[in-house]
A protein has these predicted regions:
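C-terminal substrate-recognition "lid" of short-chain dehydrogenase/reductases
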Residues: 110, 170, 204-233, 238
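Substrate-binding pocket helix/loop in short-chain dehydrogenase/reductase
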Residues: 89-90, 97-102, 185, 196
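Active-site loop immediately N-terminal to the catalytic Tyr-X3-Lys motif
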Residues: 91, 139-145, 167-168, 203, ...
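Active-site helix of classical SDR
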Residues: 113, 150, 158
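Residue(s) in the substrate-gating loop at a strand-loop-helix junction
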Residues: 134
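Alpha-helical segment proximal to the catalytic Tyr-Lys
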Residues: 118, 163-167, 224
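Conserved glycine-rich cofactor-binding loop
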Residues: 10-11
Length: 239
């Protein structure tokens, strides 16, 4: 069985990705700040391993990645999914909120990728890295400047790493979802949801399954010549 690591795999889109990989026969390691009922129930089956860690802490990340490799072997796939958003115009956003978003969305992804790539390079077996970005990083949205900055940075990291790791047969791509039916959009008002749906050519919010299909493709042999790309899964809202 191939081993996949998923950051932020305990809820929302991350949980859906973990479920899909388990269905496909992967051994999955995931980590986050807190366990969930899904994690506790699924770990008992033996193919899901959960570790409690804050990805913004580089020392903790190194320890957790080492433990994962010791337990399940060097991963073939890494999905950087951990993320958070804090809304507010930049001029009045507290520094603590800025730091929290940057630490989780960008620094955490850098620390996790750095630790995992070291093992991939030593293994010399190629690999796949998928960064979960956002349409917010491609288009400007008022009140989300910090979140947009971190997601755009993930896309930049994707392109640079694709060049660094391509000679070692490790592909690096990002997926930029639009608005999805997850807990991150549950706080939207009916008016806000209606506005998003009206602006989306396909006439609905996205579903985790829409993203999972792209994840599965990027991890497959059919995607072995695809790297350095950001794939928008947004129902056409960016057209």
């Amino acid at each position: 069985m191939k081993h996949a690591m998923v950051s932020g795999g305990t809820r929302g889109l991350g949980e859906a990705i973990v479920r899909a990989l388990l269905e496909d026969g992967w051994v999955v390691s995931t980590f986050g700040r807190h366990s969930t009922a899904f994690v506790e129930a699924t770990q008992a089956a033996g193919h899901l391993h959960f570790y409690q860690a804050d990805t913004a802490d580089p020392a903790a990340v190194e320890r957790v990645i080492h433990a994962m490799v010791e337990r399940a072997g060097v991963p073939f796939a890494l999905i950087n999914n951990a993320g958070m958003a804090r809304e507010g115009v930049l001029a009045s956003m507290p520094v603590a909120d800025i730091d929290a978003v940057v630490s989780t969305n960008l620094s955490g992804a850098l620390y996790v990728t750095r630790a995992v790539v070291r093992h991939m390079l030593l293994e010399r077996a190629g690999g796949r890295i998928v960064n979960i970005s956002s349409i917010i990083g491609h288009r400007g949205y008022s009140g989300l400047a910090v979140y947009a900055a971190t997601k755009a940075a993930l896309d930049g990291m994707t392109r640079a790493l694709a060049r660094e790791l391509g000679p070692r047969s490790i592909t690096v791509n990002s997926i930029a979802p639009g608005y999805l039916e997850t807990e991150m959009t549950h706080g939207l008002s009916a008016a806000q949801r209606g506005q998003i749906v009206r602006r989306t050519p396909l006439g609905r919010l996205g579903r985790p399954a829409d993203v999972i299909g792209v994840v599965r493709f990027l991890l497959s042999a059919e995607a072995s010549f695809l790297t350095g790309q950001s794939i928008l899964v947004d129902g056409g809202i960016s057209c």
